[in-house]
Amino acid sequence: MVARLRAKPGGDRVAVVVGDMARAEDLPAGAFAVVLVAFNTFFSLTTAEDQARCFAAVADRLTADGSFVVEGFVPDDELIEAGSKVEVRSLTARRVVLTVSRHDAVTQRAEGQFVELTEEGGVRLRPWSLRFAPPEELDAMAAAAGLVLAERWSAWDGTPFTAASAHHVSRYRRPGSSPA
């Protein structure tokens, strides 16, 4: 992924750190104006403790008016109550991708495989595992780390977040810091 970023125009201007975002020692030293965890990546931390450690480590590295931005899906009742399921993710004449997953409402864990079937290549398995958390739980983790919710949208274009939103972009900051 880093190589793909570097190949893009301006990709060399983005600071990239490869490490475990739950381990403070893996994060770079210094103060940052923005720390972004995009596209459900935060949920790749598969325990509540690791998620809370990430908030604390990031809060420790923000400038006085810095922001921590988390993008993720909003767990819905269907996900939480699903148990196990198989869904068609994509289907063409030469390729089928299935999502096979199992969800546990108590642990807020989901694990699964993207199963790719092709005429030419047989079967390819792409495993995944996550711990989902509703925005309110993320807000509590932020508060425990000394951050407050500054803004929340349902999309990057600033669409207002509502109870019906399927996704969120949440920006956290230190209390009393500049709201911008």
Across the structure, where does each feature detected by a protein language model lie?
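C-terminal lobe and adjacent flexible extensions of AdoMet/dcAdoMet transferase-like proteins
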Residues: 131-180
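A short beta-strand submotif of the Rossmann-like class I SAM-dependent methyltransferase core
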Residues: 37-39
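Conserved SAM-binding loop
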Residues: 5-6
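A short acidic, Gly/Pro-enriched loop at the edge of an enzyme's catalytic core
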Residues: 25-35
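A short glycine-rich, Lys/Arg-flanked "PGG" loop and its adjoining helix->strand segment in the class I
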Residues: 50-67
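SAM-dependent methyltransferase
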Residues: 69-141
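Conserved SAM-binding strand-loop segment of SAM-dependent methyltransferases
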Residues: 10-23
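A short His-aromatic
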Residues: 43-45
